[in-house]
């Protein structure tokens, strides 16, 4: 995914395309395509770079559970985050960038250990919270040019992914307790 982000930004910058117009446009039927495309599009190289490092680091943390897991988390976060942004963000705006996915990854890593009752995953979540906690909180504060809606719903998508992808052990324990 990161390679695609960089190739698209290079094309946007050098060829002069207007790929950024394919972001999420709230409550516009044409804007629904942005649910799938917006994480790959960035305003400039600075925007892309600020998303690349946490995307790769947290993505690798999720990928420790396998390729299917990281792809599943990514799909859930993109869907929940994109739909939430499309429904709630102000009209006549365009939302682009991978930060919603980054917030989803962080929320997933924070919640996964609790859901699965796994010590290693709990430790990983605590590390994410310690390193990125203030960034996560500040990203939810409404500011000009920042899609706090994308951050919020990306985070919600991460929580949904943690519950939806809970390990069988956790699910079987829950069933036994019921």
What are these regions (language model features)?
Residues 1-178:
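A detector for small-residue-rich transmembrane helices and their helix-helix packing motifs
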């Amino acid at each position: 995914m990161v390679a695609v982000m960089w190739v698209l930004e290079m094309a946007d910058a050098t060829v002069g395309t207007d790929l950024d117009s394919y972001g999420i446009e709230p409550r516009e039927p044409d804007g629904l395509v942005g649910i799938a495309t917006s994480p790959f599009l960035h305003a400039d190289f600075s925007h892309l770079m600020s998303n690349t490092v946490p995307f790769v680091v947290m993505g690798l943390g999720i990928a420790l559970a396998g390729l299917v897991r990281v792809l599943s988390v990514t799909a859930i976060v993109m869907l929940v985050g994109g739909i939430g942004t499309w429904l709630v963000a102000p009209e006549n705006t365009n939302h682009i960038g991978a930060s919603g996915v980054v917030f989803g990854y962080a929320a997933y890593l924070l919640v996964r250990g609790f859901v699965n009752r796994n010590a290693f995953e709990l430790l990983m979540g605590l590390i994410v919270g310690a390193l990125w906690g203030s960034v996560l909180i500040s990203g939810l504060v409404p500011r000009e040019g920042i899609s706090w809606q994308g951050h919020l719903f990306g985070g919600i998508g991460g929580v949904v992914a943690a519950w939806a992808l809970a390990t069988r052990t956790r699910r079987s324990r829950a069933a036994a307790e019921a």
